Curated annotation (Swiss-Prot):
Record carries keyword Acyltransferase: no
Protein's organism: Yersinia pestis
Name of the protein this chain belongs to: Large ribosomal subunit protein uL22
InterPro entries membership: Ribosomal_uL22, Ribosomal_uL22_bac/chlpt-type, Ribosomal_uL22_bac/org-type, Ribosomal_uL22_CS, Ribosomal_uL22_sf
Single GO term (MF): rRNA binding
Length: 110
């Protein structure tokens, strides 16, 4: 049974989160959690929370056994960017894009 968990509008760029997502794709859930725990990146904490949510969803909603679960799919899409302005010299201004991402984790017992 496939179970999904999503985190929308995560305050990190999709490019940075994808680096972490690639580490756990296809792994068993226990191994993936261990990998994320010792990965020294902000995105690792975001992905770990979504993975824990997917595990809880599988256990509570589908009655799945945690030991059998694998990360079958994980993907990161770009979310909306917040536009901000950075004042510069001589009355000019630069645009700053504060990027967000949508993190989706799918776990399955197959």
């Amino acid at each position: 049974m496939e179970t999904i968990a999503k985190h929308r509008h995560a305050r990190s760029s999709a490019q940075k989160v994808r680096l972490v997502a690639d580490l756990i794709r296809g792994k068993k859930v226990s191994q993936a959690l261990e990998t994320l725990t010792y990965t020294n990146k902000k995105a690792a904490g975001l992905v770990k929370k979504v993975l824990e949510s997917a595990i809880a969803n599988a256990e509570h909603n589908d009655g799945a056994d945690i030991d059998d679960l694998k990360v079958t799919k994980i993907f990161v899409d770009e979310g909306p960017s917040m536009k901000r302005i950075m004042p510069r010299a001589k009355g000019r201004a630069d645009r700053i894009l504060k990027r967000t991402s949508h993190i989706t984790v799918v776990v399955s017992d197959r």
